[in-house]
Curated annotation (Swiss-Prot):
Disulfide bonds join C30-C482, C68-C293, C80-C92, C113-C155, C297-C321, C489-C493. It is found in: Virion membrane; Host apical cell membrane. The keyword Disulfide bond applies. Major glycoprotein, comprises over 80% of the envelope proteins present in virus particle. HAMAP family: INFV_HEMA. One of its GO terms (molecular function) is host cell surface receptor binding. Its main location: virion. The record marks R345, G346 as: Cleavage. Residues 17-530 are extracellular. Keywords: Clathrin- and caveolin-independent endocytosis of virus by host, Clathrin-mediated endocytosis of virus by host, Disulfide bond, Fusion of virus membrane with host endosomal membrane, Fusion of virus membrane with host membrane, Glycoprotein, Hemagglutinin, Host cell membrane, Host membrane, Host-virus interaction, Lipoprotein, Membrane, Palmitate, Signal, Transmembrane, Transmembrane helix, Viral attachment to host cell, Viral envelope protein, Viral penetration into host cytoplasm, Virion, Virus endocytosis by host, Virus entry into host cell. This is Hemagglutinin. It comes from the Viruses. Glycans are attached at N23, N24, N38, N54, N181, N301, N499. It comes from Influenza A virus (strain A/Duck/Alberta/78/1976 H3N8).
């Protein structure tokens, strides 16, 4: 009995040895791509959620919290609005003749002079802000028969009563206020901004005390425009001890044109003009501190980097800024489709190619080879296909930034309550633009992601086809991204396949011979190793059963006698 069992064991071992020797005459070569345990989800045209090995965030969602003073010239308005600095409010004298790229208005800014209003406040503010300068040139206006340099206790300049430094308050001289008619030509080659005003007394008595006439009139004209203002006498809410008001107006005089001022009372006259410039200067309301740093893009929240194509920090920007979108995140695929590697590969340690899964741990390339031959297993990257994919993906982010970054500023849109309908329309237009840009951004990123994934898949297929053309009938496609090579292929042979120097003819006869020796039907299942072992065990078991049956039959015939002793 023991002899039979030992013989069965050696017979099965021989079968196993034959199987191993058969494997030594073949090799397996698989092609695969890089994979990571946890990829990044991106959106493409065809799939809202597809996992890739690597992706770059495209939306800047936070600011530095401070405004950088380089490369843009930042002028901190502190407690002065731009209009107060323009008019020459006593507490804003420090801003005379200042220049800026961006004037930062603070929420703590206040007026500290005679109360005024500007009927076209936003236009004047925007005009001066874009000019980028408060450069003022005094001119020699002749005001005959009136008292100049009027002041008010509401506008202290030091201990004495004062007034806006860029304006001249004209009142009666004695008991008369003659009709004033003054002209001032523009003989220069640039536009001149004249700021003037009309005083609205709180009572009729104040009107006659200051200007004699019961009702004044101010007319300012050029060849292109004319404005006539009649004072509106009446009491208003008290501000800094005054219930009267001054309305501020402005006139632009082109080169070769003439400014004409005509008035019989209530005129707040200009002292000169502001030199207008064209440029990209602007104004922004912000309470962010100004710091010494470098940033091309500024928002009211603070400076932000402009190395991303989109941002959702603030709609108001200045400089070369990412485009504002509603989305909090948009990810650009900068890697290939991610298929995490399966950890269990069977009893024989089988390898699989890109059709089944990706390969983790490929640190030197995106695409590569794994092999299994008589010398063991190995892995190497294919640098050529890796570089081809990287070259096409590199620069993708920069191209998106170039398409979307604004090289100009988005100014604030403000309107008075009277212009509420215009404000609503402007808000609707701005919201629509943001919606369109947000949708366009999402579509652009989805298109780029689709292109990246298709590109990386294509490079994998190119490498597979290149390998198949080299091997020809010397190997068989296994269907999982691998080739079964029907000849002995050591590491040098594998290397020749990888670098493209493999000579098909050298191994042709051996491969054809091995094809005939190997069984025609080959198991293709992923559980081939298990099935082979199970079949092997069953065969050995059946052999033992047959031998035992033969022994029992022989015993019954008397050919073999079995004695059992107790």
């Amino acid at each position: 009995m023991k002899t039979i069992i030992v013989l069965s064991y050696f017979f099965c071992l021989a079968l196993s040895q034959d199987y191993s020797e058969s494997n030594n005459s073949t090799a397996t070569l698989c092609l695969g791509h890089h994979a990571v345990p946890n990829g990044t989800i991106v959106k493409t045209i065809t799939d809202d959620q597809i996992e890739v090995t690597n992706a770059t965030e495209l939306v800047q969602s936070s600011s530095t919290g401070k405004i950088c003073n380089n490369p843009h010239r930042i002028l901190d308005g502190r407690d002065c609005t731009l209009i107060d600095a323009l008019l020459g409010d006593p507490h804003c004298d420090v801003f005379q003749d200042e220049t800026w790229d961006l004037y930062v208005e603070r929420s703590s800014a206040f007026s500290n002079c005679y109360p005024y209003d500007v009927p076209d406040y936003d236009s004047l503010r925007s005009l001066v802000a874009s000019s980028g300068t408060l450069e003022f040139i005094t001119e020699g206006f002749t005001w005959t028969g009136v008292t100049q340099n009027g002041g008010s206790n509401a506008c202290k300049r030091g201990p004495a009563s004062g007034f806006f430094s860029r304006l001249n308050w004209l009142t009666k001289s004695g008991s008369t206020y003659p009709v004033l008619n003054v002209t001032m030509p523009n003989n220069d080659n640039f536009d001149k901004l004249y700021v003037w005003g009309v005083h609205h007394p709180s009572t009729n008595q104040e009107q006659t005390n200051l200007y004699v006439q019961a009702s004044g009139r101010v007319t300012v004209s050029t060849r292109r425009s004319q404005q006539t203002i009649i004072p509106n006498i009446g009491s208003r809410p008290w501000v800094r001890g005054q219930s009267g008001r001054i309305s501020i107006y402005w006139t632009i005089v082109k080169p070769g044109d003439v400014l004409v001022i005509n008035s019989n009372g209530n005129l707040i006259a200009p002292r000169g003009y502001f030199k207008m410039r064209t440029g990209k200067s602007s104004i922004m309301r912000s309470d962010a501190p100004i710091d010494t740093c470098i940033s091309e893009c500024i928002t009211p929240n603070g400076s932000i980097p402009n190395d991303m194509p989109f941002q959702n920090v603030n709609k108001i920007t200045y400089g070369a800024c990412p485009k504002y979108v509603k989305q909090g995140t948009l990810k650009l695929a900068t890697g290939m489709r991610n298929v995490p590697e399966k950890q269990t590969r069977g009893l024989f340690g089988a390898i699989a190619g890109f059709i089944e899964n990706g390969w983790e741990g490929m640190i030197d390339g995106w695409y590569g080879f794994r092999h299994q031959n008589s010398e063991g297993t190995g892995q190497a990257a294919d640098l050529k296909s890796t570089q081809a994919a990287i070259d096409q993906i590199n620069g993708k982010l920069n191209r998106v930034i170039e398409k979307t970054n604004e090289k100009f500023h988005q100014i604030e849109k403000e309107f008075s309550e009277v212009e509420g309908r215009i404000q609503d329309l402007e808000k609707y237009v701005e919201d629509t633009k943001i919606d369109l840009w947000s949708d366009n951004a999402e579509l652009l990123v989805a298109l780029e992601n689709q292109h990246t994934i298709d590109l990386t898949d294509s490079e994998m297929n190119k490498l597979f086809e290149k390998t198949r053309r080299q091997l020809r009938e010397n190997a068989e496609v296994m269907g999982n991204g691998c080739f079964k090579i029907y000849h002995k292929c050591d590491n040098a042979c594998i290397e020749s396949i990888r670098n493209g120097t493999y000579d098909h003819d050298i191994y042709r006869d051996e491969a054809l011979n091995n094809r005939f020796q190997i069984k025609g039907v080959e198991l293709k299942s992923g559980y081939k190793d298990w099935i082979l072992w199970i079949s092997f065990a069953i065969s050995c078991f059946l052999l033992c059963v047959v031998l035992l049956g033969f022994i029992m039959w022989a015993c019954q015939r008397g050919n073999i006698r079995c004695n059992i002793c107790i």
